[in-house]
Amino acid sequence: MQLVLAAKYIGAGISTIGLLGAGIGIAIVFAALIQGVSRNPSMKDTLFQFAILGFAISEATGLFCLMISFLLLYGV
């Protein structure tokens, strides 16, 4: 029983590594937004819409990793 519990904790910890990628992805999206607005301020509204879309896609991958982690901890 202790081995199964340890495996659940290790699996949940490993599955949260995907959150690192989501954080980096969000940082890249908003860095590109700042760079794009500084180059062409008149495109601010259009660039912001694309940045929010990129943020949502990046955040979704992080939430999927977090969901798998919770499923490993509490679902099995």
UniProtKB/Swiss-Prot annotation:
Record field: transmembrane: 13-35, 50-72
UniProt KW Ribonucleoprotein keyword: no
GO terms assigned for molecular function: ATP hydrolysis activity; identical protein binding; lipid binding; proton-transporting ATP synthase activity, rotational mechanism
Gene Ontology cellular component terms for the protein in this record: mitochondrial inner membrane; proton-transporting ATP synthase complex; proton-transporting two-sector ATPase complex, proton-transporting domain
Signal sequence segment: none
Entry's family note: Belongs to the ATPase C chain family.
Task performed by this protein: Mitochondrial membrane ATP synthase (F(1)F(0) ATP synthase or Complex V) produces ATP from ADP in the presence of a proton gradient across the membrane which is generated by electron transport complexes of the respiratory chain. F-type ATPases consist of two structural domains, F(1) - containing the extramembraneous catalytic core and F(0) - containing the membrane proton channel, linked together by a central stalk and a peripheral stalk. During catalysis, ATP synthesis in the catalytic domain of F(1) is coupled via a rotary mechanism of the central stalk subunits to proton translocation.
Name the UniProt record assigns to this protein: ATP synthase subunit 9, mitochondrial
This protein's encoding gene: ATP9
